Amino acid sequence: MNHYNRTIGSMLILVYSMLAAFLFIDKVFVNIIYFQGMFYTQIFGIPVFLFLNLIIILLCIIVGSVLAYKINQQNDWIKTQIERSMEGETVGINDQNIEIYSETLDLYHTLVPLNQELHKLRLKTQNLTNENYNINDVKVKKIIEDERQRLARELHDSVSQQLFAASMMLSAIKETKLEPPLDQQIPILEKMVQDSQLEMRALLLHLRPLGLKDKSLGEGIKDLVIDLQKKVPMKVVHEIQDFKVPKGIEDHLFRITQEAISNTLRHSNGTKVTVELFNKDDYLLLRIQDNGKGFNVDEKLEQSYGLKNMRERALEIGATFHIVSLPDSGTRIEVKAPLNKEDSYDD
């Protein structure tokens, strides 16, 4: 309303000022007879002088209202641009449905650099947030990794050694002549200790995984299989094609292999696990398969941390992750990762 009042008032002052100046300058036009005629002559029963004033006021109101409406449009548009700028949007005049006056454009052109500076500040804030997150993420991962290493050392130095000692003692006892029912219970105890040792090795593999370091993916998997062949009663075989794999996905695939073998050792109750790695020209295929008891995939996929971790690692490198498992028919895990031939030769 302030714009309307100011505009109409200004127009009234302007019109009456011009009329007064005109009457003052034109001495001939201003005379007693004229004023008498203005007061005594009527239009629609209204004196001409009063009628003309009403017409002037009405015209000022109409014209002033139109001008005030236009000014309000300009101000509302500028206000909208400022609000958009504060909300992080890019200001512009391409989406406006009103005529923009030159004065408004001058104000808008002053606003554009401010909007650009706000955008830069937001980007800097995001970068700082990301940097802080990355720093904190690295610290957290380092803390977790150190704690996993510590737990692995303690388990290896205490529980693993005790299980080994118990296994040796049971083997020695078996060599002696035992009376029933001890002769039947000792093999059961020995089997329990062996299962515990297998579980412990799988747990240590999970807590303290081997790294590729300077090895290729194929070399790392071969070394892992050879190491397991010496330590676990399960038969571990491999069929590995050694080829160049982009460094960005090698570590993820190796961790998936470790996780899959660890789960097999702990839960499958099988006698054999096979690890395969093939180059299929435009993609690689990693397959881990066992002949264990199998499981219900739909139930385990959401409950098992290991399976979810493998799937997430596969998705991070743009690979597909499939599990096929049937009761008493074993489990097969397949990961297919795309290969970029140009990138595969970049170290």
Swiss-Prot record:
Assigned keywords, A-Z: ATP-binding, Cell membrane, Kinase, Membrane, Nucleotide-binding, Phosphoprotein, Transferase, Transmembrane, Transmembrane helix, Two-component regulatory system
| Organism field | Staphylococcus aureus (strain Mu50 / ATCC 700699)
State where it is primarily located: membrane
A single GO molecular function term of this UniProt record: phosphorelay sensor kinase activity
- Domain called Histidine kinase: residue spans: 150-341
According to UniProt, the name of this protein is: Sensor protein VraS
Q: Which GO terms describe its cellular component?
A: plasma membrane
What gene is this protein a product of?
vraS
* Gene3D superfamilies found in the cross-reference section: 1.20.5.1930, Histidine kinase-like ATPase, C-terminal domain
UniProt catalytic activity: ATP + protein L-histidine = ADP + protein N-phospho-L-histidine
